[in-house]
């Protein structure tokens, strides 16, 4: 992008605002190097990064990037074998700690926020935990080495503290004891790195020792008393040892950094990028900016676009469309109406968007991707100072025409001004034609009436104007697309008190065509205002409807959530009760089994049926949908005399003998005939086949013959197989078998899986597993009981 346009549109002031948001040296470099991008993919990626930063700012207060100095010079010194000082090591330590903090920050958010680019940027970080801990332990943030930097440093510092304590104790005797009267002041100070006391010159001989300094008047001598000379010597030796150890540690730490300088430098650059993203997000928040859509076809639509350098309390937002149905817009109308500001707003927001910045415009605004943006705006002064002077720069226009392409955006302010009006209008039309022939996009402002007709008659060109309030005689600074500007001179003059005779005489002097054109423009303005009023009413109604819809959706979501929670709570409670009852049932079965083992022949079939319950059938399935399917399936089944059914309350299979009424049937269960409620009956299909395959436990008053140690479920339907398995396991338990074999075959695996799930839930099963290969392999399961 050419440098001239960046200056003309005050792009540098956006950079200055962004610089106020960065906190790292690398971040500042990225802001200073920021330029509008021309690759659509790169533009979208830059906008994605800003969107990620905005999400992090909104949800977590931003990416945790602290102030970081430029560590590149320090790393270069390490590369040549130099020893870094404490401040340089502290700066590098902060970089490494920040890398770890950001890596953890983003890792923790991976299940919460779907960032578009930050996770990819995170992959560029190299976390160096050991080196980071070493520096953090050894170096304080101010660059001072800590006592934990080495045992030797800790020891020598403890020695220094001890000696200093001895010195302070002896010095206290001088400042507070009998000899304090010989001192100028009862204080202890330091001269030449040694502890001294201020002695009156005439009492020099009272203390002996060494004189290190004297006052300006010579009346006070700073004396190191003889009694502490040895202590000061020991202190000095310890201090020198401390310095030597510090230098050794600094060299050691510098050597430890040497293998990682490239990774640390790359980390610092990535942290600068995170800082840059943070800054873009903060600037967007400050400007109430939004993410623009990117149009590869240069279909620009800025909604309620505001210039970012104008006071937000005074700026007027405008909708600025360009590129969809027309590539040229001619804005006509009087001066000081906001035409120049509109041009600059379009140009600057386009540059900001192509730089990956959010723009001060409403949601769903679109920017294009232009290779170049050119402008001929005569004043080139700060719009913050509200200065608008207009002059023609034909040399600049010639330069623009030589460089533009079909992917250029051109902004002309007061095109053709500064010369004879007739010639200026002709030049303006010719220049616009030249731009149109290339296929470039152009917005031009002018006050020449001839260009109004140009806007009507030229393909892909539309007129526009800046609104003027004829009642207040003030511009509103609102852009009216599709409506050319009209002169308000007659209305303004009349309202300011110009005699009506003069106004009417002036009107008679203009051509009828001009008069009709002004009337037509006036009618267009009225129609536009009516359309705007209708649009606003419709928009408000739509917003109200959307609000009601959102409230209803939220209420419905809350209802369904609470309903499901209550149903789940009820199911959990029911399952708890069923589990307790199941435990009791297991105890009963165990007792029956014990009775059969200790006293055969005492267990009757009616006792077995009464002990065996259908509590497992009452256990609620987790998915609610499954229960509904089962209920619907039950409703479809019609019962008839002779049908083989399963009695849910006893978990037994029987035959229907007679229907008493709609709610009860007589069922043959073994040797018993029982009256059973209809809703406890389930019809079993292919009953003859099932009856032939079902294992039978023969029970009589005098004894009970045990079932086989093998159950073959092959060929059965799933429901019948599960019922047979349940009955067989109970019979095997009552028979006292230590283990049995269930043959289920391979097939689709449905029955095998059902067997596995059943055995997993049964409390009487100790272990289970597939049979050996020579005994059926995965087609059979061996069950061991407790």
Swiss-Prot record:
Binding site for ATP: 333-340
Domain (Smr) ranges: 711-786
Keyword Transferase among UniProt keywords: no
Catalytic EC class: hydrolase
InterPro entries, A to Z: DNA_mismatch_repair_MutS_C, DNA_mismatch_repair_MutS_core, DNA_mismatch_repair_MutS_sf, MSSS, MutS, MutS2, P-loop_NTPase, Smr_dom
Domain of life: Bacteria
Alphabetical GO biological process terms: mismatch repair; negative regulation of DNA recombination; rescue of stalled ribosome
Keywords: ATP-binding, DNA-binding, Endonuclease, Hydrolase, Nuclease, Nucleotide-binding, RNA-binding, rRNA-binding
GO molecular function: ATP binding; ATP hydrolysis activity; ATP-dependent DNA damage sensor activity; endonuclease activity; mismatched DNA binding; ribosomal large subunit binding; rRNA binding
EC number: 3.1.-.-, 3.6.4.-
Summary of the function given for this chain in its UniProt record: Endonuclease that is involved in the suppression of homologous recombination and thus may have a key role in the control of bacterial genetic diversity. Acts as a ribosome collision sensor, splitting the ribosome into its 2 subunits. Detects stalled/collided 70S ribosomes which it binds and splits by an ATP-hydrolysis driven conformational change. Acts upstream of the ribosome quality control system (RQC), a ribosome-associated complex that mediates the extraction of incompletely synthesized nascent chains from stalled ribosomes and their subsequent degradation. Probably generates substrates for RQC.
Family statement drawn from the similarity comment of this UniProt entry: Belongs to the DNA mismatch repair MutS family. MutS2 subfamily.
Subunit structure: Homodimer. Binds to stalled ribosomes, contacting rRNA.
NCBIfam families for this protein: mutS2 (TIGR01069)
Name recorded for this polypeptide: Endonuclease MutS2
Provenance organism: Lacticaseibacillus paracasei (strain ATCC 334 / BCRC 17002 / CCUG 31169 / CIP 107868 / KCTC 3260 / NRRL B-441) (Lactobacillus paracasei)
Lineage: Bacteria, Bacillati, Bacillota, Bacilli, Lactobacillales
Gene responsible for this protein: mutS2
């Amino acid at each position: 992008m050419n440098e001239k346009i960046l200056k003309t549109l005050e792009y540098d002031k956006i950079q200055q605002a962004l610089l106020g948001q960065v906190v790292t040296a690398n971040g500042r470099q990225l802001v200073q190097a920021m330029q509008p991008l021309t690759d659509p993919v790169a533009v979208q990626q830059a906008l994605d990064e800003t969107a990620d930063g905005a999400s992090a700012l909104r949800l977590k207060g931003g990416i945790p990037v602290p102030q970081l100095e430029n560590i590149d010079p320090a790393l270069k010194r390490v590369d040549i074998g130099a020893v870094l000082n404490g401040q340089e090591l502290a700066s590098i330590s902060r970089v490494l700690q920040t890398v770890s903090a950001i890596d953890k920050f983003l890792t923790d958010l991976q299940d919460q926020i779907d960032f578009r680019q930050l996770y990819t940027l995170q992959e560029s970080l190299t976390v160096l935990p050991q080196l980071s801990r070493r520096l953090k332990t050894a170096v304080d943030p101010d660059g001072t080495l800590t006592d934990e930097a080495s045992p030797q440093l800790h020891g020598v510092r403890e020695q220094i503290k001890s000696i200093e304590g001895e010195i302070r104790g002896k010095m206290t005797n001088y400042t507070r004891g009998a000899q304090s009267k010989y001192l100028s002041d009862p204080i202890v100070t330091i001269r030449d790195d040694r502890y001294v006391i201020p002695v009156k010159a005439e009492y020099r001989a009272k203390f002996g020792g060494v004189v290190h300094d004297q006052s300006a008047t010579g009346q006070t001598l700073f004396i190191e008393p003889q009694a502490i000379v040895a202590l000061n010597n020991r202190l000095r030796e310890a201090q020198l040892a401390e310095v030597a150890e510090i230098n050794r540690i600094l060299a050691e730490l510098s050597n430890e950094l040497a293998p990682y300088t490239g990774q640390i430098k790359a980390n610092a650059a990535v942290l600068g990028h995170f800082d840059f993203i943070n800054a873009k997000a903060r600037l967007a928040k400050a400007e109430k900016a939004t993410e623009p859509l990117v149009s590869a076809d240069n279909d620009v639509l800025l909604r309620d676009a505001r210039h970012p350098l104008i006071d937000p309390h005074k700026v007027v937002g405008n909708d600025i469309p360009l590129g969809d149905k027309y590539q040229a817009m001619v804005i006509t109308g009087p001066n000081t109406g906001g035409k120049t500001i509109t041009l600059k707003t379009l140009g600057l927001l386009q540059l900001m968007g192509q730089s990956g910045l959010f723009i001060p415009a409403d949601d769903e605004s679109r920017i294009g991707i232009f290779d170049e943006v050119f402008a001929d705006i005569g004043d080139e002064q700060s719009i913050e100072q509200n200065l608008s002077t207009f002059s023609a720069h034909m040399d600049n226009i010639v330069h623009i025409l030589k460089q533009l392409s079909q992917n250029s955006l051109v902004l002309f302010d007061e095109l053709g001004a500064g010369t004879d009006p007739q010639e200026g209008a002709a030049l303006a039309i010719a220049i616009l034609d030249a731009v149109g022939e290339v296929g470039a996009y152009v917005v031009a402002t002018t006050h020449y009436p001839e260009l109004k007709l140009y806007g009507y008659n030229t393909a892909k060109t539309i007129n526009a104007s800046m609104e003027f309030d004829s009642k207040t005689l003030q511009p509103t600074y609102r852009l009216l697309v599709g409506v050319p500007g009209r002169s308000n001179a007659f209305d303004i003059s009349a309202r300011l008190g110009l005699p009506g005779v003069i106004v009417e005489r002036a009107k008679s002097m203009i051509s009828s065509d001009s008069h009709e054109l002004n009337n037509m423009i006036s009618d267009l303005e009225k129609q536009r205002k009516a359309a705007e009023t209708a649009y606003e009413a419709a928009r408000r109604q739509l917003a109200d409807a959307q609000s009601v819809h959102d409230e209803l959706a939220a209420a419905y979501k809350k209802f369904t959530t609470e309903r499901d929670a209550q149903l789940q709570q009820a199911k959990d409670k029911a399952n708890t009760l069923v589990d307790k009852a199941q435990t009791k049932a297991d105890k009963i079965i165990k007792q029956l089994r014990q009775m059969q083992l200790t006293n055969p022949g005492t267990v009757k079939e009616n006792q077995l049926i009464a002990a065996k319950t259908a509590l497992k059938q009452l256990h609620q399935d987790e998915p609610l949908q499954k229960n509904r399917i089962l209920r619907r399936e039950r409703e479809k089944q019609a019962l008839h005399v002779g049908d083989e059914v399963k009695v849910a309350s006893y978990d037994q299979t029987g035959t229907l003998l007679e229907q008493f009424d709609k709610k009860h049937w007589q069922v043959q269960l073994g040797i018993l005939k029982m009256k059973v409620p209809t809703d406890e009956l389930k019809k079993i299909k292919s009953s003859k086949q099932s009856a032939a395959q079902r294992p039978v436990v023969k029970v009589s008053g005098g004894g009970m013959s045990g079932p086989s140690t093998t159950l073959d479920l092959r060929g059965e339907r799933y429901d019948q197989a599960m019922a047979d398995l349940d009955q067989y396991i109970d019979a095997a338990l009552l028979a006292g078998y230590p283990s049995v074999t269930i043959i289920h075959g391979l097939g689709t695996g449905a029955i095998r899986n059902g067997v596995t799930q059943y055995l997993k839930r049964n409390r009487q099963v100790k272990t289970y597993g597939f049979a050996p290969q020579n005994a059926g392999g995965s087609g059979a399961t061996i069950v061991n009981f407790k």
